[in-house]
């Protein structure tokens, strides 16, 4: 594509696809931003009915700390579900690692940093054990992790004697600590939190600039400049607003350390799933295992490392929870696997595998977190909270199932089809797969017309094979 062509692609009129391009394009991306819109609506509704408590700095910080471990579990769970598996043991594994880490510091005199290394190593060992059964023995992940859920729950209660084990103050920092204050700066905000927000916004601007530059260099079609500007302005406003919100919290508090750990994991795993060979193999195996194997993907190895990674993240989540609670107890981790699975499905993952994103799972987890928090602020009972969470999960998965039924367009697809001008998807077959199979076969090509005098005459066929023996 020439530079003239590239400029032409940027100077067209308004199209509905420009809005889609603002968010990355594709039905899965639109679904994620639909969920993000639902999250914003939930927050605003509870903000109104709670008299402004939902978005108060103290409450937002509390939500980040209280649900960070569920969001960390959702990061690993989405990879497991993309592969077509399920992990029911994450809550028990988190509790098991938590009690071992607490005992190692309280009774075995481990320093806090050595206890963290022990916990991560123990999570990797548990994950390797379960991954071995799933990947190389062939036992379904549902059965393996169900057994793990029972085994490690019992191990937690056996090792801890069904009592709470406290942890030292240094360890508490990873679950209940905050970014430090900088003395001598006369502003009513936490400076490290503001710096973190500015750096995040600057990285977002740089990333968008680099993306457009690469598109221009490759000659691919770019969205209009106003699309990139609007997207960057909106996202930077959200980031800087969050930085101001966290930085103006209770005296002595700022952005929590558990939130820093969560953000680091989100960035890391978003990169792994989107920009590495291993991430592409996860989607390939989850989408079509046989085709991936024929393409040379070692599906068993992918199964093994995905299961091991899930247990490592469960160990991290368990240690953060123990640090925030300042002790490890026998009831830690109960129901965590259900919250993580619900977050992944609400975030747009497919039950059949092959579809899902880290960002979508985080958004789904935040939906669950603010639902819980908002109903608690409004003094709803635990029974009502559970019923609402179940209804939200059912609706989210039901919408996904409806969108995938052959011959039925999704709501987003219907709007896109109605609003795009003719030729918007020229050259792309949008017929559902099931409908294609029912279409009539293409008509036979027309018989050739009379041959012109200028057309070359084909060579005469050798009819020697048709002659009778002995004929000349």
Model region roles, listed by residue range:
Residues 1-44, 164, 201-232, 241, ...:
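Cytosolic-side transmembrane-helix boundaries in multi-pass membrane proteins
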Residues 207-222, 268-307, 468-470:
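Membrane-helix/interface signature in polytopic inner-membrane proteins
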Residues 66, 141, 164, 168-170, ...:
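Loop-to-transmembrane alpha-helix initiation sites
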Residues 51-62, 157, 245-259, 270-279, ...:
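Inter-helical junctions in multi-pass inner-membrane proteins, predominant
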Residues 40-49, 53-108, 130-142, 273, ...:
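Single transmembrane alpha-helix segments in multi-pass membrane proteins
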Residues 85, 127, 307-320, 324-390:
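Transmembrane alpha-helical segments in multi-pass inner-membrane proteins
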Residues 152-273, 330, 409-422, 428, ...:
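Transmembrane helix-bundle core of multi-pass membrane transporters
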Residues 109-150, 363-364, 368:
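Alpha-helical transmembrane segments within multi-pass membrane transporters and channels
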């Amino acid at each position: 594509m020439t530079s003239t062509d590239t400029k032409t692609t940027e100077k067209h009129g308004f199209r509905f696809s420009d809005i889609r391009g603002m968010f990355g394009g594709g039905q899965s991306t639109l679904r994620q931003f639909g969920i993000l819109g639902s999250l914003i609506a939930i927050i605003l509704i509870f903000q109104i009915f709670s008299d402004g408590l939902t978005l108060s700095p103290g409450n937002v910080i509390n939500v980040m700390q209280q649900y960070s471990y569920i969001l960390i579990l959702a990061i690993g769970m989405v990879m497991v579900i993309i592969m077509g598996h399920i992990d029911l043991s994450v809550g028990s594994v988190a509790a098991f690692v938590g009690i071992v880490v607490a005992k190692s510091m309280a009774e075995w005199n481990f320093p806090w940093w050595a206890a963290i290394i022990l916990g991560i190593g123990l999570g990797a060992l548990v994950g390797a054990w379960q991954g071995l059964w799933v990947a190389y023995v062939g036992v379904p992940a549902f059965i393996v992790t169900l057994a793990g859920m029972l085994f490690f729950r019992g191990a937690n209660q056996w090792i801890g004697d069904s009592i709470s084990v406290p942890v030292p103050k240094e360890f508490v920092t990873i679950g209940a600590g905050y970014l430090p204050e900088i003395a001598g700066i006369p502003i009513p905000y936490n400076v490290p939190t503001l710096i973190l927000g500015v750096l995040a916004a600057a990285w977002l601007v740089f990333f968008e600039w680099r993306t457009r530059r690469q598109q221009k260099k490759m000659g691919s079609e770019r969205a209009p400049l106003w699309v990139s500007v609007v997207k960057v302005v909106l996202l930077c406003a959200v980031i800087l607003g969050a930085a101001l919100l966290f930085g103006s919290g209770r005296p002595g508090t700022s952005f929590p350390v558990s939130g820093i750990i969560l953000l680091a994991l989100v960035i890391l795993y978003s990169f792994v799933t989107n920009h590495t060979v291993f991430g592409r193999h996860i989607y390939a195996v989850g989408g079509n295992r046989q085709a991936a194997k024929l393409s040379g993907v070692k599906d068993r190895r992918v199964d093994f490392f995905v299961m091991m990674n899930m247990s490592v993240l469960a160990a991290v989540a368990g240690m953060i929870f123990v640090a925030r609670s300042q002790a490890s107890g026998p009831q830690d981790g109960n129901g965590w696997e259900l919250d993580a699975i619900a977050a992944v499905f609400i975030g747009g993952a497919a039950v059949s595998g092959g579809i899902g994103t880290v960002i979508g799972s985080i958004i789904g987890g935040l939906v669950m977190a603010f639902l819980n928090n908002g109903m608690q602020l409004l003094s709803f009972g635990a029974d009502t909270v559970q019923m609402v969470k179940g209804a939200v999960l059912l609706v989210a998965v039901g919408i996904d199932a409806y969108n995938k039924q052959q011959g039925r367009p999704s709501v987003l697809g219907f709007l896109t089809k109605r609003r795009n001008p003719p030729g918007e998807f020229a050259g792309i077959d949008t017929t559902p797969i099931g409908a294609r199979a029912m279409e009539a076969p293409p008509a036979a090509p027309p018989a050739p017309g009379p041959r012109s005098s200028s057309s070359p005459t084909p060579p005469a066929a050798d009819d020697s094979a048709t002659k009778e023996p002995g004929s000349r």
